[in-house]
Regions:
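Domain-level signal for soluble alpha/beta catalytic cores
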Residues: 2-508, 514-848
Length: 848
């Protein structure tokens, strides 16, 4: 395992000084079998047999007590422990069994030199224990930075921040962890792994969602529940976000997908300012009605978030007193996810895995991987996504490159341009673990086989990281020639996976296709094996279809015929070339015949206006070679690649590397203004519309903006600087007292890519500093961000100063706690619910 240690060391995966250095899974397979340290009462909670009552908001109580939370409220545990303990006691007295200590932002990045993480956690947990609560929960919130590839913080840096908190909390005597208010699924994963790998305390994990029912990165409650359940948290749920009534549909979605108990800690509605104080719209009686409905549906852990106080918690404690939770028996979902897209299977459903990011037999891809040309690989990912694949295979298996490092890079890059789940394809467990560790979502590993060495190496990785896994029907003796032999190997793999607690819904058996040209008799055996595996083992199947035609002419015809036969035998996930029209037709038709395409709506939409000759012609024209530069169009697209040399497609799909050539060709016949106003701007408008409709999420939005910027840069370089002169300047800041800057940083990146000059003043910014920037740079538009209700006053003060000293300046505001009503109350001109809205405001105010 020295290779893995070297990779982790070279890529920064070494914990902070004094921490516990992470042991690779393969050196300690038992680490995948997590045993939780807790008492029997908590064990009953984790089994879903007992209710558990958390406390409510800390910030709300600090405000009511008249305490100034300041920029680092966690420091109050050191400077004013009596008041913090007093707040905990108030919650305990009304029925809170768990107090959440005041450590939400107590990570090294936020604390800086103000205090050590260990000291803050020790003081906070001492306050919690002094309250007499049954359990003390160590609170772990977001780092305040956006993780790569969208942001700048490496996964391992986030992991180290969380690991330091975990070790400090465990050493100080915490009873459990509550990882909360997470909006980035990858950041949540880093925190969960830090907790799993550095402690054996129970892990409660909750995410926060917007009004559209997704996080700002596009994660739905269903996906969150699937991924967190697979990662092995003990309780999952939702906190903050919205009021309890607004959360009900999201909680219902989680309850249907979560295999562990579900918790809810809602806000007391939306905040507003009355007489200079923050008040919330939902009173305790209305709050408890919504919570009661969620409890009746299956929620078993309750508490409160922003705006709640002991009055709310008292009603929750009374609600569940003397009751047992609703019995829930949720089968694990069968399928895989990215952060924003789930490919799930039920009944006879089928899903396709795009095969084109695999260097075997592909000279161009091999050359691209050797040269580090990831743009070519991203083109393949986008092409397959547009063509309708349900997942993408990613393989970097070349002996002359660093496979682990390349695979890690590919995973991050591909997840930035494609929403599809990925199949991590490698025979090297080191590379597999490196890639799945930084994957956002639930991937599938390809593969494990029947050799004991392989089982011992790969299955612990699949369990620890919550992955599905492909099992190859081969062992030390090779590939059995008969269906019975293949089945025997598959059975061994499934039984070994059972020992690790890997559910059968996460196991996909590959019965291994042999070439009909050399192993003709085995083709029928493969089909028999698929049926046996499905019927006797209760697992799904996967198959690399194109191998069957090796050595034969007109390979696509052979592959297509075999694909149809395999579907009939029970194949669930074929690995194929999605650019082939013939394959797509077979998949679309099978989905009608097996009932997956209800009422044949998808089939009718795709083929109603096509003649048989047109379909046959398309099938004949498509080959298994395909073309990454000329992908099949996605449904509903009307790209005219001839008229604009692919420019609109490249912007919409975020293909930054393709932009220089497309723009240069357009400039041969168009002037710069025509390229901008006739092509680039409409393409960005298209992207914005897709974002508003929920078809695109933040990663796609940012990738498209970067592609557009690449186009603007070419115009500048070729003498069109006048046409792309600075579109205007905007100053942005996180207001005084608030040290959270994820949202602000996203706005900065987007606006810069749209061509605006952005003066980013940082976080915890004094009102005077904003005014100084406005005066120095003649700023006409200012953007302000706040995450916490306790810091909205800083936003109001900044706007008041600007109104007095620079009345012509327009102000837009945003942030987790900000609403349109709030924006109006603090005197802002515009409310921006997301980064895309800020780009619209810039266009309106700055006229560009």
């Amino acid at each position: 395992m020295e290779a893995l240690r070297s990779f982790l060391r070279d890529n920064g995966r070494i914990h902070f000084e004094g921490g516990r250095v992470m042991t690779p899974i393969n050196d300690n397979p038992t680490r995948a079998m997590r045993v939780v340290r807790c008492d029997e009462t908590m064990a009953a909670v984790l089994r879903g047999e007992r209710f558990l009552v958390f406390d409510g908001a800390m910030g709300t109580m600090l405000q009511q007590a008249g305490l100034e939370a300041g920029e680092l409220p966690e420091l109050l545990c050191l400077t004013n422990p009596e008041e913090i303990t007093g707040i905990h006691i108030q919650y305990v007295e009304v029925g809170s069994e768990v107090v959440t200590v005041n450590t939400f932002g107590a990570n090294r990045r936020k604390l800086g030199d103000a205090a050590s993480v260990a000291d803050v956690f020790a003081a906070a947990i001492a306050c919690g224990k002094a309250s007499g609560a049954k359990y003390v929960a160590a609170d772990i919130g977001p780092t305040g930075a956006l993780l790569e590839p969208l942001g700048t913080m490496p996964f391992d840096e986030a992991y180290e921040l969380f690991a330091e908190q975990v070790c400090a909390a465990d050493a100080a005597g915490a009873d459990l962890f509550i990882i909360e208010t997470m909006a980035d699924l990858l950041e949540m994963k880093a925190a969960i792994l830090a907790a799993k790998e550095n402690s054996d305390l129970p892990i409660f994990a909750t995410m926060t969602f917007g009004e559209d029912g997704r996080t700002f990165l596009g994660t739905s409650p269903q996906i969150a529940a699937i991924v967190l359940s697979s990662l092995g948290v003990d309780v999952l749920g939702v906190n903050c976000s919205l009021g309890p009534n607004d959360l009900r549909p999201m909680v219902s979605e989680m309850l249907k997908a979560s295999t562990v108990p579900v918790m809810v800690q809602a806000n007391a509605g939306l905040p507003s300012i009355v007489d200079g104080k923050t008040v919330f719209s939902v009173a305790p009686d209305e709050y408890i009605e919504a919570v009661a409905a969620m409890v009746d549906e299956g929620v078993s852990v309750v508490g409160g978030c922003c705006g709640t106080n002991p009055d709310y918690i008292a009603k929750e404690a009374a609600l569940v007193a003397g009751r047992a939770p609703v019995e829930r028996d949720v089968a694990p979902a069968c399928g895989i996810t990215s952060a924003s897209h789930a490919t799930l299977l039920a009944g006879r459903d089928v899903a396709t895995i795009g095969e084109r990011i695999n260097p075997t037999g592909k000279k161009k891809l091999k050359a691209a991987l050797r040269e580090g040309n990831l743009d070519y690989v991203l083109g393949e990912a986008i092409s397959q996504t547009e063509a309708g694949a349900d997942a993408l295979d990613v393989n970097a298996g070349l002996p002359e490159i660093d496979e682990a490092a390349t695979l890690v890079s590919l995973v991050g890059k591909i997840q930035g341009v494609s929403p599809l789940p990925l199949q991590i394809d490698s025979s090297d467990p080191v590379a597999v673990e490196a890639a799945v560790r930084v994957y956002s979502g639930k991937p599938i590993i390809n593969s494990v086989n029947g050799k004991q060495e392989s089982l011992d190496a790969v299955l612990p990785i699949a369990k620890h990281y919550g992955c599905a896994v492909v099992g190859l029907a081969l062992d030390e003796r090779g590939i059995p020639p008969t269906a019975e032999g293949r089945f025997a190997v598959a059975q061994r793999i499934v039984e070994e996976a059972d020992k690790y607690g890997i559910p059968r819904s996460d196991i996909f058996i590959d019965c291994l296709v042999m070439a009909a040209s050399t192993n003709q008799a085995e083709v029928v055996e493969i089909l028999r094996a698929i049926t046996m595996v499905k019927e006797r083992l209760g697992v799904r199947t996967v198959l690399g279809v194109s191998n069957v035609s090796f050595g034969l002419p007109l390979r696509e015809i052979v592959n297509a015929t075999f694909l149809a036969a395999a579907f009939s035998a029970g194949l669930d996930m074929p690995i194929l070339n999605p650019l082939s029209a013939r394959y797509r037709e077979i998949v679309d038709t099978w989905r009608v015949l097996c009932g997956q395409d209800v009422s044949a709506q998808g089939y009718i939409s795709e083929y109603a206006n096509k003649s048989m000759s047109a379909v046959a012609g398309a099938a004949g024209a498509a080959t298994v070679q395909g073309s990454a530069s000329a992908p099949a169009p996605a449904a509903g697209d009307a790209f005219d690649d001839v008229a604009d040399f692919g420019l609109r497609r490249f912007v919409v799909t975020g293909r930054k590397a393709n932009m220089p050539e497309a723009v240069s060709k357009l400039l041969e016949t168009c002037d710069a203004m025509e390229v901008i106003n006739g092509h680039l701007i409409p393409a960005l408008d298209d992207v914005g519309e897709r974002f508003e409709k929920g078809k695109f999420f933040l990663p796609q939005l940012m990738a498209s903006a970067e592609a557009a910027k690449a186009g603007f840069d070419v115009i500048k370089e070729q003498g069109g600087s006048g046409a792309v002169a600075d579109k205007g300047s905007v100053a942005i800041a996180t207001v005084k007292g608030d040290i959270h800057d994820i949202g602000k940083n996203i706005v900065r990146m987007l606006l810069e890519n749209y061509g605006y000059t952005v003066y980013d003043l940082g976080r915890d910014v004094e009102p005077q500093a904003v005014l100084d920037c406005v005066r120095e740079h003649d700023i006409k538009l200012v953007g302000l961000s706040a995450l916490m209700t306790t810091t909205v006053r800083g936003m109001e003060d900044t706007i008041a100063l600007l109104r007095e000293q620079a009345p012509d300046v327009k102000v837009f505001v945003g942030g987790a706690v900000i609403t349109a009503e709030y924006a109006e109350m603090v005197g802002a001109d515009y409310y921006c619910k997301d980064a895309a809205e800020s780009a619209k405001v810039c266009g309106e105010v700055l006229g560009a």
